[in-house]
Amino acid sequence: DSSTSRGLGDVYKRQFLNCFALADLLVRAAPEEKTGLFALVNNITEAVRAMFWLPGEARPRAGLWYPAYWEDVEESPAHILLHTFSGQGYHYRQCFLDGKILSAEYDAIFPDGHAAEDQGVAAMLCFDRLRWPWNLTEKAKAPYREFLAAHTGLVLQRLLKAQDTDSIKDLLALDVLDAAAFAEGAALAAKADNAAAAALLADAEHKKRGSAPKKRRYDFDF
């Protein structure tokens, strides 16, 4: 993890160049503020998450993932260097203007396709965007919820590995798990030997079943 302040200069650009083991950037600012995040994420090609978490607050205000991308450089016969980028991570890193995040542009990328991306990172991107929905419109929520509902197991694997019970509660609160997802989650919790997670999943499934509308029965006497 790395904690960052609002203003980040060339020293940070040099510090994070070619960094491949970074997981989270902790930004001590509100997501709508101008920060040095653009400089950081554009010098990190691996997947990284920026968490906007102000001191004294119980939860982050936003968690934005920047998936990995690859840059290829080819020299043409005319000795012109041609740069090509693979992976949506490059496009996510361009969603800034004057140091501020362009949330609408960021959210517009996901529906364009993510089949070639790390599906675990894509699932976490959806999860974090939904549980900390800064500037998230109802229209933008739909593709995130759809993808997350189909890949809850990938998120649970990460959360169980981290023993992050609070985040498991956040996932359950989004109400995206169906019967198959609950069954997969129970199996993952058992494999991880995590009784607390298993209990949370069982309780959430029981409540969901209990809240489902019951079919009406009609009795006819002839």
Roles of regions detected by a PLM:
Residues 1-12:
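Short, small-residue-biased leader/transition segments that mark boundaries at the very start
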Residues 3, 15-170, 174, 179-222:
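N-terminal capping/linker segments that flank leucine-rich repeat
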